[in-house]
Amino acid sequence: MKQIDLKILDGRIGNEFPLPAYATEGSAGLDLRALTESALTVAPGQTVLIPTGISIYIADPNLAAVILPRSGLGHKNGIVLGNLVGLIDSDYQGPLMVSLWNRSDKPFTVEVGDRIAQLVFVPVVQASFNIVNDFAQTERGEGGFGHSGKQ
């Protein structure tokens, strides 16, 4: 298992609330919690930025982290990430924040300590560009959105 440096920014982490951890042996994501001062109600259509109480330093340029929504919040309550996906670069060391967007027509209350998103580590390949005049032909070619069909 890869070791990632984690800084606790809120003393409730590790005391009232656990460190992010994998729920099962097969889990890909670690749950991030809302570490606000008090419960926060998100109005329909509103976007709020919520602290998680931690920062991480990945340090390895072959890794990044993504902050992804929790499926139940989106499906059952209309709560999704305001930026859809949060990308954490390997050299970022600041606090992890979660942008929550209430896309429903009902207010939603985030309680202190609620699991609001998940953190997933992903491999990164940094690429350079080779300028060409033409590409070798493929079956798909320039076919764009919907070109490959539905089934």
From Swiss-Prot:
Gene3D superfamilies: 2.70.40.10. Its EC number is 3.6.1.23. GO terms for biological process: dUMP biosynthetic process; dUTP catabolic process. GO terms for molecular function: dUTP diphosphatase activity; magnesium ion binding. The keyword Mitochondrion does not apply. It is an enzyme of class 3 (hydrolase). It comes from the Bacteria. Transmembrane segments: none annotated. Pathway: Pyrimidine metabolism; dUMP biosynthesis; dUMP from dCTP (dUTP route): step 2/2. Keywords: Hydrolase, Magnesium, Metal-binding, Nucleotide metabolism. InterPro entries: dUTPase, dUTPase-like, dUTPase-like_sf, dUTPase_trimeric. Its cofactor is Mg(2+). CDD domains: trimeric_dUTPase. It catalyses: dUTP + H2O = dUMP + diphosphate + H(+). The keyword Magnesium applies. Substrate binds at R70, S71, G72, N83, L87, I88, D89, M97. HAMAP family: dUTPase_bact. This enzyme is involved in nucleotide metabolism: it produces dUMP, the immediate precursor of thymidine nucleotides and it decreases the intracellular concentration of dUTP so that uracil cannot be incorporated into DNA. Belongs to the dUTPase family. This is Deoxyuridine 5'-triphosphate nucleotidohydrolase. The gene is dut.
